[in-house]
A protein has these predicted regions:
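TPR/TPR-like (Sel1-like) alpha-helical repeat modules
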Residues: 45-47, 59-80
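Residue-level signature for tetratricopeptide repeat
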Residues: 26-27, 55-57, 93
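Terminal, low-structured helical/coil segments at or just beyond the last alpha-helical repeat
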Residues: 82-99
Length: 99
């Protein structure tokens, strides 16, 4: 799936089938459903989920907690626009998980 198609899927009521937890959480974040997104990543152990988890805490303004999750994801804390970060995470995760 391309990042553009992933973003267009936000017009639907459910995420595309078969998304890994990090992408499903990012999808719900794109729908402004922070709680659903957070539930999908809060108990996952991988770096991809940690990256989305960091993004979610950045969205809520909890930069200390976001910093913890960026470190767990082995990523530098984002500084710019939240939408730009959402797009960058989506593009990276989609590329890494392409068939």
């Amino acid at each position: 799936m391309t990042p553009a198609k992933f973003e267009r899927s936000l017009s639907k009521s459910k995420p595309p089938a078969g998304l890994m937890p990090a992408l499903a959480a990012l999808w719900w974040a794109g729908k402004d459903d922070w709680d659903k997104a957070h539930k999908l990543v809060m108990d996952e152990g991988g770096a991809d989920c940690a990256w989305v988890h960091a993004y979610l805490h950045r969205v809520e303004g909890d930069l200390d907690n976001a910093g913890y999750w960026y470190r767990r994801a082995r990523r530098k804390p984002a500084q710019g626009d939240l939408q730009a970060e959402w797009t960058a995470i989506a593009a990276t995760l989609l590329a890494a998980n392409a068939p």
